[in-house]
Regions:
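Ferredoxin-like iron-sulfur electron-transfer modules
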Residues: 37, 67, 246-259, 275-304, ...
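A short, conserved structural fragment
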Residues: 80-91, 310-311, 856
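Short, amphipathic alpha-helical interaction segments positioned at domain boundaries
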Residues: 94-132, 878
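Flanking helices and flexible, charged tails adjoining ferredoxin-like Fe-S electron-transfer domains
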Residues: 307-361, 374, 420-422, 426-455, ...
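Beta1-alpha1 glycine-rich phosphate/pyrophosphate-binding loop at the start
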Residues: 368-371, 377-378, 419-423, 458-526, ...
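Glycine-rich dinucleotide-binding loop and its adjacent helix/turn
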Residues: 429-450, 508-528, 552-606, 710-726
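FAD-site-proximal beta/loop scaffold in flavoenzymes
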Residues: 561-585, 668-740
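A conserved FAD-binding loop/helix module that cradles the flavin
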Residues: 599, 736-764
Length: 894
């Protein structure tokens, strides 16, 4: 073990400032090991001579260490390069001056921001994280209100219309005050990335330096010079990407060297409050307030809030207490500071109040903000509504026609009369994407304002693959989609008949992906035509495998090899490719799901006079959408319930009929459904064709799955949150992971995979830190008090029907009119609203930038401001006394 170096110990004590006096320094102390492997004793002597936070000339320092200016010049250059000194030109003196700041904020940031130094001395990144963590743990309880070394400064647009705003609370004050600016990587994120602990918020072009700080950063290559206008652009882009602002808080009010664009999951300054409970030290003078009359619980503010102060709740009256007071252990009121700590603050973000929120948003697998887009549609703001929907679902026109509408199933209005026709409204909104003049194409949205260069391959152009593609392309990634089929869309194109999803509707939404820069390579089977290894060699950094479950499950009865027997998915694929599968005059479809409904209705359109659906359970257990069942019955399809195939009969190699057994319902199976059992009663039905639609399996084809593990069902195994497989650069999703589900499930999974891939392709990022788990819970409708007397009594609007298209391959359903949309949106009860926890709110104002409804604003509630670092010892002493008094008062009250 290397011997402890006294000069480095002494220097560490000096730089430690207020805490350096009492801190024990040994070889394991971050303030020691960050310098011990870098500084020489001669360099340490010069730094010691400089003292803390004093501007010194080279002549002064040379005299103090007994050397000439020429002798110490290279040592000064080294100290500046390391980040121990800040160098800037003193215009009055006409020469450079040297300034030694405290460790943090100060020296450690500058050390980390010297990229070459961080690469050659990775202990610097570790020291920054450890030092700031130790400092917060030891000093957090003693920091006076508003005296955090870093402090939140609100988004300036959030201050509009507020009286009593001080100049130093406005970002524009600093941009106007200084005349030189630079931008550097975020040092906190760079530190975390060096430790493999990044949160997906990248460090490039994040921290804006001003004045002498900018001069130093520019001269030492830590940052690039920018204009005032570019600084503002970076700040605004940070806000667009969900980042708030923090500033160095150790000078007099209105003085600062930098504006940081921070995230809660990486920033060491915010950690003082979010992990160690000292929120009063870091919060601004403002708190968020929600106007519940305007709030529609869209959740945009909630997902952005760095302090987790905003949660989705309800605004319907209830027999439950909807405002339970959290049992906080406040730092200012406890003698045991650790009780107020939250070591899991990067993992435990909650989106919803314990009492729940709007059932529609909760029930949707993608958590689409239904209440929000209904309100926008009611106001005629259709483009805004489309934009809001696409934050969670990039294919609303598709889903407006084929979704299984779990939002409507759970709609609170259904307890009064009928659920709101949510899907029909969505279809009306989304049809704006069918026209170039009205469609919504999102603009590039990432932290650097230009495309990333990391190439990503998506294998499978179905709903999961295209959803992942949309969100990656929106972030600026070059994405190539490979699909072995001749056209993109997967099951949306080839597994759903045109009378339910007309292909021009899907094509319009796929064309938006092309406009976003996505390349489709159809007719290319990965594994046969090109391998993943070859794609890696071409520079692809990540892969999303979403090939679906596109193989029909076998019936498992004799006669399946006969001509005239089809698998349901194979049959639909042929129909959608323009083929005419021979069904004859009599056709039986085996199964009871939505695929079976699509198949039987397609058979009717292909000329079958008698079409049967044979289902082994009763009508009550039929899993298909009731609307589709009704439409099939109206088209003449005959349903035979409690009927199971035993053998397919044939002659000369062709189907002639099917032998079936009458079933009865027995005891419930493991899923709670009553299991069908044979009765011994048999029947023969004369047929020309049999189509099995009892399920689908994954066909991995020639794709090399040796690096993946699969389940007994043949689906891929992967992490349930991140979708990462055993092969680190391969992620999976959609039906090839879950088994057959609905398009909206695949769409939701695709977005999560995009989040994972973004993190994966950038070194040093974790897949989970700071990630929103999106755990939703619905309000308890049993406790809701609905005052129905004042309700609009309009019944649910019904879509029109074009009889001329009946039994054709065109969609006979007619989209709502604008008048119908307005009437239907008025039926929404507006169940949800955002709730603010004023104790957790740090007053950043970021929430106000996300709200399209003018429902959330900042309010000034205090007037705290710090002085210079040199005043802190006195303020700390005052704070300790004040805290002791609070603890005593609380004890007396008890």
């Amino acid at each position: 073990m290397a011997q402890l170096r006294p000069k480095i110990v002494k220097l560490a004590k000096i730089i430690g400032g207020v805490t350096g006096i009492t801190t024990k320094i040994d070889e394991n102390a971050p303030e020691y090991y960050c310098m011990a492997g870098i500084l020489s004793d001669d360099e340490a002597d010069i730094a010691i001579a400089a003292g803390l936070r004093k501007e010194r000339t080279a002549g002064y320092l040379a005299k103090k260490v007994g050397k000439t200016v020429e002798e110490i010049a290279p040592l000064l250059d080294n100290l500046v390069y390391y980040g121990i000194f800040r160098r800037s030109m003193d215009k009055a003196l006409g020469e450079d001056v040297y300034y030694m700041q405290i460790f943090a904020p100060g020296i450690l940031e500058m050390m980390v921001n010297q990229k070459e130094l961080l690469e050659t001395h990775p202990e610097v990144g570790r020291a920054f994280e450890e030092y700031t963590r130790n400092l917060a743990a030891n000093m957090g309880a003693m920091i006076p209100d508003g005296y955090g070394l870093m402090r939140v400064i609100p988004v300036e647009s959030a201050l509009e219309g507020i009286e009593g705003v001080s100049d130093y609370e406005r970002i524009s004050h600093y941009l106007d005050k200084y005349d030189r600016f630079s931008v550097s990587p975020c040092s906190c994120r760079a530190s975390r990335s060096s430790l493999g602990d990044g949160c997906g918020h990248l460090e490039e072009d994040m921290c804006v330096q001003m004045g002498r700080g900018a001069e130093h950063y520019i001269r030492t290559g830590r940052a690039r010079e920018i204009t005032r206008e570019q600084a503002l652009e970076i700040i605004q882009r940070a806000e667009e990407n969900g980042l708030m602002h923090d500033m160095v808080n150790i000078e007099e009010p209105g003085e600062s060297a930098a504006i940081c664009n921070c995230c809660a999951c990486a920033c060491f300054g915010l950690r003082v409050g979010l992990m160690f409970g000292a929120r009063d030290a870091i919060r601004s003078n403002y708190v968020a307030e929600v106007d519940e009359a305007k709030c529609v619980a869209c959740g945009q503010c909630v997902e952005t809030c760095p302090g987790n102060a905003l949660k989705l709740g309800q605004k319907l009256c209830s027999t439950e207490d909807l405002t339970p007071q959290p049992d906080y252990v406040k730092l200012s009121e406890t003698i045991h500071p650790k009780r107020s700590w939250n070591p899991d603050y990067r993992e435990d973000h909650e989106d919803v109040m314990p009492t729940g929120t709007a059932p529609c948003k909760t029930a949707c697998p993608a958590h689409v903000p239904v209440q929000g887009y209904l309100k926008l549609a009611a106001q005629g703001r259709y483009t805004d509504a489309l934009e809001l929907i696409k934050k969670e679902n990039p294919f609303p026109a598709v889903c407006g026609r084929i979704c299984n509408k779990r939002c409507e199933t759970e709609c609170t209005r259904g307890a009064v009369d009928e659920a709101v026709a949510i899907d029909e409204v969505k279809r009306f909104i989304a049809d704006h994407d069918q026209h170039e003049a009205t469609r919504f194409v999102p603009k590039l949205c990432n932290q650097i304002g230009r495309p990333y260069t990391e190439k990503i391959a998506v294998i499978g152009a179905g709903p999961a693959g295209m959803s992942c593609t949309y969100y990656l392309a929106n972030k600026g990634y070059p994405v190539t989609v490979f699909d072995r089929n001749p056209v993109p869309g997967g099951m949306l194109t080839l597994g759903i008949p045109n009378f339910r999803l007309e292909k021009d509707v899907l094509t319009a939404e796929i064309d938006i992906l092309r406009e976003m820069g996505v390349e489709f390579r159809c007719g290319v089977e990965v594994g046969r035509d090109i391998t993943i290894e070859q794609l890696r060699a071409q520079g692809y950094k990540g892969f999303y495998v979403a090939i679906g479950a596109q193989k029909s499950a076998r019936l498992g009865v004799a006669g399946e090899e006969l001509t005239g027997v089809y698998g349901g998915v194979d049959f639909l694929r042929a129909v959608n490719l323009g083929e005419q599968p021979a069904v004859g005059k009599r056709c039986a479809v085996i199964g009871g799901g939505n695929v079976a409904m699509d198949v039987c209705r397609s058979a009717v359109r292909l000329g079958a006079d008698e079409t049967y659906v044979l289902y082994r359970r009763s009508e009550a257990e039929l899993p298909a959408d009731p609307e589709e069942v009704k439409e099939a019955m109206e088209e003449g399809v005959r349903f035979r319930f409690l009927t199971a195939p035993v053998e397919i009969l044939g002659a000369d190699g062709k189907v002639t009929g099917i032998r079936v057994e009458r079933m009865a319902l027995g005891e419930p199976d493991e899923k709670g459904r009553r299991k069908p059992v044979g009765t011994g009663e048999f029947e023969t039905i004369a047929l020309d064709s049999v189509i099995g639609a009892i399920g689908q399996t994954v066909d991995w084809g020639t794709l090399d799955t040796s690096a993946l593990t699969t389940t007994k069902r043949g689906t891929a195994e992967a992490d349930a949150l991140t979708y990462q497989t055993a092969q680190p650069d391969i992620f999976v999703g959609g039906d090839c992971y879950t088994g057959p589900k609905f398009a909206i499930d695949a769409i939701a999974a695709g977005k999560e995979a995009a989040i994972s891939l973004h993190r994966f392709v950038h070194p040093g990022q974790t897949l989970t830190a700071g990630r929103d788990r999106r755990v939703y819970r619905a309000l308890d409708k049993e406790h809701v008090l609905l005052e129905t007397a004042g309700f609009d009594k309009d019944h649910r609007q019904m879509p029109g029907y074009n009889a001329a298209k009946a039994k054709t391959f065109s969609d006979a359903r007619v989209t709502f009119t604008e008048e119908q949309v307005k009437k239907e949106c008025a039926r929404c009860l507006g169940c949800g609203a955002t709730k603010v926890d004023s104790y957790l709110c740090i007053g950043c104002g970021l929430c106000t930038t996300k709200c399209k409804f003018d429902a959330i604003h900042l309010k000034k509630v205090r007037d705290w401001h710090a002085g210079s670092y040199e005043t802190m010892p006195i303020k700390v002493a005052e704070g300790v006394v004040k805290r002791a008094g609070s603890i005593v008062k609380k004890a007396v009250r008890k």
